[in-house]
Amino acid sequence: MIYLCDYKGIDFIAMQECGRYYKHQNVSEGVNTVFDLLQNRMENPTLDNQACFLVFDEWSGFLASVPKKQQEEFKQKLASILMLGRGVGIFLLLAMQRCDTTNFLSGARDNFGVALGLGRLSKESARMLFSDEADLIEPKPRGHGYLRVDGQPTVEIVIPKIRDMSITDKVIKNALCE
């Protein structure tokens, strides 16, 4: 089960007819829905929870668009999903162009199991994603970058270019609309 929050409302526009697709000003509804699911699963524990993924594109852009009080509320919900979600089958995937600590509550970022940085990372983004190895991070061309999984040493990676995006769109749409 995937919930897709597309703040810009552009990159995943092909998904707009899916019930778990949220764009622009409606992305808060997607976060709230997954947070409510987290609360429900914690109050009614079971061993057979269906895996749930909250995919949020442009978290920092979304935060910049809401008043400070709401920013803190959403940061708290995101921190709860990060810190408690894995235990009840809820996972988070965030994408943003500029990653820095102001987008998260203190300590929340340490709960990301996987960090992926692509292209020309700023020093702040490198510190945020790869704190202990930030000085080793160098700018990379498009599709090249760094990956850290569960605290293991950071490795350089290359992301293959998708030749036919329609196939990828179909796979995403099937997961969103199921």
Regions found by a protein language model. Give the residues of each.
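Conserved P-loop NTPase
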Residues: 124-178
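P-loop NTPase catalytic phosphate-binding loop
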Residues: 1-53, 60-121, 130, 137-139, ...
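Flexible glycine-/small-residue-rich
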Residues: 6, 56-58, 120, 149-151, ...
